[in-house]
From Swiss-Prot:
<dbReference type="GO" id="GO:0004425">
    <property type="term" value="F:indole-3-glycerol-phosphate synthase activity"/>
</dbReference>
<dbReference type="GO" id="GO:0004640">
    <property type="term" value="F:phosphoribosylanthranilate isomerase activity"/>
</dbReference>
<dbReference type="InterPro" id="IPR011060">
    <property type="entry name" value="RibuloseP-bd_barrel"/>
</dbReference>
<dbReference type="InterPro" id="IPR013785">
    <property type="entry name" value="Aldolase_TIM"/>
</dbReference>
<dbReference type="InterPro" id="IPR001468">
    <property type="entry name" value="Indole-3-GlycerolPSynthase_CS"/>
</dbReference>
<dbReference type="InterPro" id="IPR013798">
    <property type="entry name" value="Indole-3-glycerol_P_synth_dom"/>
</dbReference>
<keyword id="KW-0822">Tryptophan biosynthesis</keyword>
<dbReference type="InterPro" id="IPR045186">
    <property type="entry name" value="Indole-3-glycerol_P_synth"/>
</dbReference>
<comment type="pathway">
    <text>Amino-acid biosynthesis; L-tryptophan biosynthesis; L-tryptophan from chorismate: step 4/5.</text>
</comment>
<dbReference type="Pfam" id="PF00218">
    <property type="entry name" value="IGPS"/>
</dbReference>
<keyword id="KW-0456">Lyase</keyword>
<comment type="similarity">
    <text>Belongs to the TrpC family.</text>
</comment>
<protein>
    <recommendedName>
        <fullName>Indole-3-glycerol phosphate synthase</fullName>
        <ecNumber>4.1.1.48</ecNumber>
    </recommendedName>
</protein>
<keyword id="KW-0210">Decarboxylase</keyword>
<keyword id="KW-0057">Aromatic amino acid biosynthesis</keyword>
<keyword id="KW-0028">Amino-acid biosynthesis</keyword>
<dbReference type="GO" id="GO:0000162">
    <property type="term" value="P:L-tryptophan biosynthetic process"/>
</dbReference>
Length: 271
């Protein structure tokens, strides 16, 4: 695990302990049970693929550790509606506060403003967080293999499946990919950002895609800015993408989303 991930794990475990002291697991489960049924994150992405279209998981992200504030006029419901109008299949909403200025209410508000399924984008370590995600309305959770043991990942995946949620498993290298393939979820995200150096290169997706069976749905993450980037990754069998910062920086998010997915409205600026 990188030093960055270790620091995140430290504050995350403190957060989880504090949350458990405020809201019992029983109360959290009751809140989750009151939510409407999960919308089908994986199903929405497969539908785009079946229609011969690129599938986009559009990210709602206010800030990042490396770039600071990304979007000053941050309005999750408006962004969710803009992404939906632009043709996105799903949402990804940051709920981590210390590193990304995210919040649970951003997830709930964004999902309520559209018909798209939503991913809770956060660092998951405890099954309590899975119930939090469902209580806030999430349809999918993220598991980052770089920060989890095989047993931890399996436990979190099982908990999510029990709640009817989908699971996006994120990998960065061949070893993590091999471990991820032991899990059940058909959703596998390849992050093109090296968590140790923070360098980004689409070669990571191109290299790792060949290690993954055809029945998995591959998601390219990080470093995707243009329709041409999407076309490049499509040659490696990747037609679904998670994109945030490059879209979040645009004044017209709907137009930028359409441009990314169809190539009809120009090029997105690089980070």
């Amino acid at each position: 695990m990188s030093d960055i991930l270790k620091k995140i794990e430290t504050y995350k475990l403190e957060e989880i302990a504090a949350a458990k002291a405020k809201v019992s697991l029983a109360d959290l489960k009751a809140m989750a049970a009151d939510q409407s049924a999960p919308r089908g994150f994986y199903k929405a992405l497969r539908a785009k693929q079946a229609a011969g279209k690129f599938g986009l998981i559009a990210e709602i992200k206010k800030a990042s550790p490396s770039k600071g504030l990304i979007r000053p006029d941050f309005d999750p419901p408006a962004l969710a509606a803009a992404y939906e109008a632009g043709g996105a299949a799903c949402l990804s909403v940051l709920t981590d506060t210390p590193s990304f200025q995210g919040a649970p209410e951003f997830l709930t508000a964004a999902r309520n403003a559209c018909a798209l399924p939503a991913l809770r984008k956060d660092f998951m370590f405890d099954t309590y967080q899975v119930h939090e995600a469902r209580a806030w309305g999430a349809d999918c959770i993220l598991l980052i293999m770089a920060s989890l043991s095989d047993d931890e990942a399996k436990r979190l995946e099982d908990e999510a499946f029990a709640l009817g949620m989908d699971v996006l498993i994120e990998v960065h290298d061949a070893e993590e990919t091999e471990r991820a393939l032991k899990l059940t979820s058909p959703l596998l995200g390849i992050n093109n950002r090296n968590l140790r150096t923070f360098e980004v290169g689409l070669e990571t997706s191109e290299k790792l895609a060949g290690l993954v069976p055809a029945d998995k749905l591959l998601v390219g993450e990080s470093g995707i800015f243009t329709f041409e980037d999407c076309q490049r990754l499509e040659k490696s069998g990747i037609s679904t993408f998670l994109v945030g910062e490059s879209l979040m920086r645009k004044d017209d998010v709907t137009a930028a989303t359409k441009a990314l997915l169809t190539g009809h409205s120009g090029i997105l600026a690089a980070e």
